[in-house]
Amino acid sequence: MSEQHDGHLRATYNEIHTLIGKAAERIEKEYAPDFAHTFVGGGGFFPARVLRTFLKHPESKRNISIQAIGLSLYEELPSTTEEQMANEVVRTQWLGPETKTLLGRKVLIVDEVDDSRTTLQYAVRELQKDVEKELLLLPESERDAKRPKFGVFVVHNKLKPKRGTLPADVPYFSGEDIPDVWFDYPWEVKDVYEHDRMAELGRKLQAKSA
């Protein structure tokens, strides 16, 4: 077998499952969400489903709800401004009347990786805008109590300068910080056994170079 490696980072399903489980302990302690959103081309579906298992209430057996939004990001130009960045994010799936179900909730936005943070910025900003529209339909005395809180969880956070930003009052959780290199997830490949083999090879080569 050739020892050639493409330099990509990889993790197996089991490793990601375990990583999410450890992160769930922090999320439950510090945020305790009761609603989850997955987004960005489906990358958050698997993490959100695993996270729901770990956040399931031990006594009531109540699961957090999961709804999906989809975002696609075009390649950004070096001269991109914040407004232009937002315009480059395209909605492929979004909430409609379901937005009102967020009122009064602690929402957790879930994705696989925080790369440029552009899509995370867009998701938080646009969901907050939609929620504010729903709040205007309520009596003013009820709005503060019904305003939802938003948090973010990503499996991996790339250590790099971010183009996007998140509000200071939005809790942010990551399973693991990683270098700014391409990361291959097992749900993106057809041959998961080859994926796992390459993941193991990468670890061996990294150990040799350490």
What are these regions (language model features)?
Residues 1-33:
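Active-site-facing substrate-recognition patch
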Residues 31-41:
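Short glycine-rich phosphate-binding loop at a beta-alpha junction
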Residues 29-31, 55-61, 95-99, 128-145:
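Alpha-helix termini
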Residues 20, 44-48, 52, 120:
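Short, highly selective alpha-helical patches that border small-molecule cofactor pockets
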Residues 2-3, 125-210:
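PRPP-dependent phosphoribosyltransferase catalytic core
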Residues 16, 51, 109-112, 185:
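Generic structural signal for small/hydrophobic residues in well-ordered secondary structure
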Residues 36-38, 67, 108, 149-153:
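A structural signal for isolated positions on well-ordered beta-strands in alpha/beta enzyme cores
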Residues 59-108, 114-125:
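Short, glycine/charge-rich flexible loops or terminal/linker lids adjacent to PRPP-binding catalytic cores
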